[in-house]
A protein has these predicted regions:
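Thiol/disulfide oxidoreductase modules built on the thioredoxin-like
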Residues: 64-70
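TIR-domain catalytic/interaction hotspot
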Residues: 6, 59-64
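Cytosolic beta-strand hydrophobic patch enriched in CBS
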Residues: 18-21, 72-77
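Non-catalytic, surface beta->alpha helical segment in thiol-disulfide oxidoreductase systems
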Residues: 76-108
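N-terminal leader/targeting and pre-domain segments
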Residues: 1-18, 109-111
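Thiol-based oxidoreductase modules, predominantly thioredoxin-like and allied folds used
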Residues: 45-59
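Local sequence-structure signature of Cys/Sec-based thiol-disulfide redox active-site neighborhoods
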Residues: 9-46
Length: 111
């Protein structure tokens, strides 16, 4: 499990915005992952992602890493932000855009 923790840690810390999701941004394989992708794309946020369906160790490891039971999981500047419900709520209230801007992540438009 240490190798997967190192992989997760590297992705989270070396990318300003990183999304662990089911599927890919071009082809999300669950509705919740798709919602987060739509929000990030709407805001014009540059982000990287990993498909947890391709690796069982990653799928389980990310849950342990964040102590959060569900996927997708969004990280900004190394900080776990939340899953689909939290991201959607933050977006609807304008908090996600503000958080991204406060962290120095360019946002192309607001909600």
């Amino acid at each position: 499990m240490t190798d997967i923790n190192d992989f997760i840690d590297e992705k989270v810390k070396s990318n300003d915005v990183f999304l662990f999701m089911k599927g890919s941004p071009d082809f999300p394989q669950c509705g919740f992952s798709g919602q987060v992708v739509q929000i990030l794309n709407y805001l014009g946020v540059d982000y990287s992602s990993a498909n947890v369906l391709e690796n069982q160790d990653l799928r389980e490891g990310i849950k342990a890493y964040s102590n959060w039971p569900t996927i997708p999981q969004l990280y900004v500047k190394g900080e776990f932000i939340g899953g689909a419900d939290i991201i959607r709520e933050m977006f609807q209230q304008g908090e996600l855009q503000k958080h991204l801007e406060d962290k120095g992540v360019p946002v192309k438009q607001s909600a």
